[in-house]
């Protein structure tokens, strides 16, 4: 599993909330890349600051389970969406990036 934080802004003084949802799927050699993503997870919807183009950072999400049983030498695809049914910002939210949190099995990458 992974968790994430979303970094976003809005060109608006609206103080509504924004909800970002992350889902993932792993694909191995000879797997179809038209695979279904796992269940999307969203951190608590974050209110925009009310100042146009301010940086807004969400809280860390709950665990996002990656579909496809990820393993060594597999590629992972992520899908991030805005869930407007769970937020209240009436302006366009602009996703700037995400911070992805994950645990590795090795102390180094050697």
Where are these regions (language model features)?
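Beta-strand-rich interaction/scaffold domains
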Residues: 19-54
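Extracellular Ig-like/FN3 beta-sandwich strand-entry sites
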Residues: 1, 17, 71-75
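Beta-strand-rich interaction surfaces with strong enrichment in secreted/lumenal proteins
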Residues: 9, 43-51, 63-67
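Extended, low-complexity, turn-rich repeat/linker tracts enriched in Gly/Pro/Ser/Thr and Asp/Glu
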Residues: 9-17, 28-30, 86-89
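A short beta-strand element within beta-rich, extracytoplasmic domains
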Residues: 1-10, 18, 98
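Cysteine-clustered segments with highest specificity for TGF-beta superfamily mature ligands
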Residues: 55-86
